[in-house]
Amino acid sequence: MRARELRAQTLDQMKDELAKLKKEQFNLRFQKATGQLEKTARVRQVRRDIARIKTFLHQKLSESKV
């Protein structure tokens, strides 16, 4: 997910995307533990997407409070 796409999203859309990515991260961890994970780079990508979304959420929340 690109930063440009995130800036265009509303808070609710970001929260939905964050929940979806957390579920995916959970499933990827299980697949990794059982040895079924084929694309190991996806774990890193999802983790970074989660961090990116949290960063933009925090920025939007702080902007709305000011």
Swiss-Prot record:
* Chain segments annotated as transmembrane: none
Q: Name one GO molecular function term.
A: structural constituent of ribosome
The UniProt keyword set, sorted, is: Ribonucleoprotein, Ribosomal protein
- Does the record bear Heme in its keywords? no
A Pfam family found in this protein is: Ribosomal_L29
Endpoints of the signal sequence: none
Q: Does the keyword Ribosomal protein apply?
A: yes
- Note the CDD domains from the entry: Ribosomal_L29_HIP
Q: Which GO terms describe its cellular component?
A: cytosolic large ribosomal subunit
Q: Name one GO biological process term.
A: translation
State the family it belongs to.
Answer: Belongs to the universal ribosomal protein uL29 family.
What PANTHER family has UniProt attached to this entry?
60S RIBOSOMAL PROTEIN L35/50S RIBOSOMAL PROTEIN L29, LARGE RIBOSOMAL SUBUNIT PROTEIN UL29C
Q: What is this protein called?
A: Large ribosomal subunit protein uL29
Gene transcribed to yield this protein: rpmC
